[in-house]
Each structure stands twice: as C-alpha cells, then as structure tokens.
Amino acid sequence: MQRTTVERTSDREVVVTRTVNGPARLVFQAFTQADLFQRWWVPKSMGMKLLSCTLDARVGGLYRLEFDVGGSAPMAFFGTYVDVTPHSRLAWTNDEGGDGGSVTTVTLEETGGRTLVVVRETYPSKAALDAAGTGAQDAMAETFAQLDELLGALG
C-alpha cells in the first residue's frame, strides 16, 4: 500500500505527496479529463456526489465542480488554470472563497512507470489556511488510493 503524506510546511502552505502506480502521462490525464477526474477525485467515504465536472485544462481555462452534499443547494468549487505543462505540472486558483483564495499546484515526476505526485495548497494568509482546516487534506489519502485504482484500470 502506498503512503500519502500531508504536511503543513509553513503558515500558508500544505503539501500532500504520494507515489502512484502509473506513468505521468496517465496521471496528467486523470487530473485534466473530466470523465477520468470524476472517477477518483471525491473520497467515497465522504458520501458526496459529484453532480458536474467541467475542466478546461489550459492556461486561462476554467474549472468548476459541483457537489451534492445533502443540503438544499449544491456546493461548488471553481477557478482558473494558471499553469498547464503536459505530463509534469498543473496549477489553478481556488476562487470559491472570494478574493485571495488559495492556489493549488500539482507536480508529477515519473520514475520507472510510477509517478510522484506533489500537491501544494498555498493560501493567502495563515488565517485562511487555519480556516480551511485539515479535513480536505486528510481526505487526500483516500483520494489518492482511488487514483491508484483508476490507473490500474486504465493499464
């Protein structure tokens, strides 16, 4: 079993790492193609359903994820891609919190058919990171396990 690490590296940043069983090309596709992304991104144990997933993975392109969380209105996450380097790097803004949201940066480093995935969440302030809590970061272990399952199915 692969180990996912979650580390608060500064007052403004959390870093999640895991080596997954698949080439960087497939991992990049899993992050950028909606039909693949929706198969692994939401931890099953959270009981949330992804209602819609739009990913326009190019610099300046937009993404939007809408979840059914059992309430009256869906919960949405959205932002803009600021860096898209095929098979090695992605970065996007997280704009659902208003001005000054966090930025997510994903780097991929392939070695021997396996890929080290590093996800950096950088917040505008310590208070913003504190407010975000650790729930989403803690769910990343399950999320990455689901990514590994998907990569196995894709071969």
Describe these PLM feature segments:
Residues 18, 52-55, 77-83, 94, ...:
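Hydrophobic/aromatic beta-strand elements that line small-molecule binding cavities or substrate pockets
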Residues 11-17, 24, 50, 62, ...:
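Intrinsic-disorder/low-complexity, polar/charged segments enriched in Ser/Thr/Lys/Arg/Asp/Glu/Gln
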Residues 24-25, 57-58, 82-88, 107-116:
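A short, structured loop/turn motif at beta-sheet edges
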Residues 151-155:
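Short, highly charged C-terminal tails/helix-capping segments
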Residues 27, 37, 63-65, 81, ...:
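Hydrophobic pocket/interface hotspot
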Residues 1-47:
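Hydrophobic ligand-binding cavity/cleft-lining segments
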Residues 15-16, 35-74:
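Short beta-edge strand/loop motif at the mouth of beta-sheet-based domains
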Residues 13, 91-142:
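Beta-strand/loop substructures that line and gate deep hydrophobic ligand-binding cavities in soluble
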